Swiss-Prot record:
Complex formation: Homohexamer. Forms an RuvA(8)-RuvB(12)-Holliday junction (HJ) complex. HJ DNA is sandwiched between 2 RuvA tetramers; dsDNA enters through RuvA and exits via RuvB. An RuvB hexamer assembles on each DNA strand where it exits the tetramer. Each RuvB hexamer is contacted by two RuvA subunits (via domain III) on 2 adjacent RuvB subunits; this complex drives branch migration. In the full resolvosome a probable DNA-RuvA(4)-RuvB(12)-RuvC(2) complex forms which resolves the HJ.
Pfam families listed in its UniProt record: AAA_lid_4, RuvB_C, RuvB_N
Gene designation per UniProt: ruvB
Region spans: Small ATPAse domain (RuvB-S): 185-255
Binding site for DNA: 294, 313, 318
Enzyme Commission numbers on file: 3.6.4.-
CDD domains the UniProt entry points to: AAA
Name this polypeptide is given: Holliday junction branch migration complex subunit RuvB
Amino acid sequence: MIEADRLISAGGTQVEEVADRAIRPKLLEEYIGQPQVRSQMEIFIQAAKLRGDALDHLLIFGPPGLGKTTLANIVANEMGVNLRTTSGPVLEKAGDLAAMLTNLEPHDVLFIDEIHRLSPVVEEVLYPAMEDYQLDIMIGEGPAARSIKIDLPPFTLIGATTRAGSLTSPLRDRFGIVQRLEFYQVPDLQHIVGRSARFMGLEMSDEGALEVARRARGTPRIANRLLRRVRDFAEVKHNGAISADIAAQALDMLNVDAEGFDYMDRKLLLAVIDKFFGGPVGLDNLAAAIGEERETIEDVLEPYLIQQGFLQRTPRGRMATVRAWNHFGITPPEMP
């Protein structure tokens, strides 16, 4: 199983990136959820504009699909500057980064997605650029090689990562602003789904938006993906109108249950409950029982189940919680 193949995967595709671009909020006043991030960024941006400075470098981290790219776009729009976008894996050589930096206008935003995947050579170039707005470049090779300094205009680097712990300390310490995006609450997701439905020209009730939001695993990207599939169902089965009942029927047909679990989530939980009496069960045994790689369980399946309180990691192995038993209508065993 590949994470990208799952309807409830938080990872995005190129097609979704294009589709989502049209419905993304452009300004902070349109930004839904993340109230602490929103209020802090409003202050930081206004202060930078009052001083006539570039915004401090910004690190955004958190699970995939929560709007790191959206926030970077909003920052550039609020500052009234250009946004240049790239990603860690694309910047293979120091020259790749140097080319982007030397093309920036004053106060522009350079957005590097997956910044934790920068190579050490490229990262070294970033240090003086972030700290002193200078590039140190080596010209020539061998004994004739010499270093030259190129002045850069003041700019803002926005780095995005799902793995803040993978950043080196020297890089992490150069960000003046650090923001963590949290999973969204259902009311905020309902608002996002309703807004997206209006942009897509859909007839959708508040209850229909709530049904999609409940199953979106706290993630706007998943919410918008589910909305598109519910739209397809509604257009074929119900003349396009989306009620709570139609949304529920569509998502049930797609095997996304009331908790946002798909077939693989349920398969894992039921294996722990049925085959191992609720656990504890070792990771290798669990992987063999459901026919998956242990890395898939650790990196793809487990995190959301643990976050939502359906699965526990213990020193002796994985255990299903009482909430997991109740989800399937099975009476949990009495604790000794």
